[in-house]
Amino acid sequence: MQWCTGAQFTKSITTGASNDGDDSYNSDVIIKRQDQLSYPAIIWCREKDFDWYLPSQKELVSIYKLIDLLNKRGINLHNKWYWTSQEDGGNKAYSINLDQDKPSSLHKFYHNYVRAIARF
């Protein structure tokens, strides 16, 4: 799934989704935008329910550290690239490969995995 659509990517828009906290701030920033439908990864997470959102780098690294335990419990995370909610300027956003714990800045129109998380 794309972080943003190819059409949105060509506009090189910076959304302000740059928080690395443990909350839905970045997703909330994008949901409030009039062009929110141009951000499929965030929309997909939010469509699960209002409490669901795309995790920050910090939150996704925490998931990475628990990947073996989560997979044993049936969560089925793959050692693939997953989007975080944090952008890196107008054309890139951070993604983490779950076989390592270091984020990389990738073009927003790339297709990566998405893992929604919820507040509790």
Question: How does the language model describe each region?
Answer:
Residues 37-38, 47-51, 57-120:
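C-terminal, surface-exposed recognition/capping segments
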